[in-house]
Amino acid sequence: MSSHNARILDQFTRQAVPFSQSPSVSNQKALEFIVSSAGAGPDDTVLDVACGPGLLVCAFASVVRHATGIDLTPAMLQEARKAQHEQGLANVTWDHGDVTTLPYPDAHFSIVSCRFVFHHLQDPLVVLREMARVCKPGGRIVVADMAPAPDKVNALNAEEQLRDPSHVRAMPEEELRGLFTQAGLPEPTVGHYRVECELDDLLSRSFPNAGDEQQIRKMFSDSIPSNSMDLNTCAQG
């Protein structure tokens, strides 16, 4: 196993329960926005790549024929199975695996999605090409991730790498769009949605190195006057 995958396993094994319970992660309107943007319907078969606790898979499963989630972290898949059971969904499959080499045939799914993942990938183009490989001709590929402004991306990445050591690099929207071109895909349709999150909630599902929390809090506070991390951070109370 690569050292980066080891960091992923370490972080997301510990994050599995708090991540799945976070209001910002489980935001129903955000999940519905992705499902709607994908044009999902009763004839679709869906793959969600690096599915985490399965929230998006379950959202898709309520409207499609079948939904599959794959993830590297067994603890995340355990939370995903709990979510499936709680929602009474029978049309779901969970697979354990590395998303850089998806264990599915070519042209197998009509929708292939990926949420809050690309900033954790060392080579997102490899994963996008795999997503394209397993997607049927005429299917839809959906990538949802943070997309900071070009002049603010470095500040955001510095904070995120401190908060979550498995974070690699968030990309500006133009760079994300460029990945589709490099993967031989059509120009993507771009939509935006905003999810609000309390800093305490964010830190409760993060496991930074010992002693770094105060520095992270200061980075958020210092970013407020100029919105230097492009997170629209504000102070309350």
Which residues does each PLM region occupy?
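A short SAM/SAH-binding and catalytic strip from SAM-dependent methyltransferases
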Residues: 110-122
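A short acidic, Gly/Pro-enriched loop at the edge of an enzyme's catalytic core
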Residues: 100-111
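A short glycine-rich, Lys/Arg-flanked "PGG" loop and its adjoining helix->strand segment in the class I
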Residues: 125-137
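Short alpha-helix
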Residues: 169-183
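Class I SAM-dependent methyltransferase SAM/SAH-binding core
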Residues: 47-49, 53-101
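Conserved Class I S-adenosyl-L-methionine
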Residues: 53, 124, 187-237
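Conserved class I S-adenosyl-L-methionine
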Residues: 1-41, 55-59, 76-79, 86-87, 142-167, ...
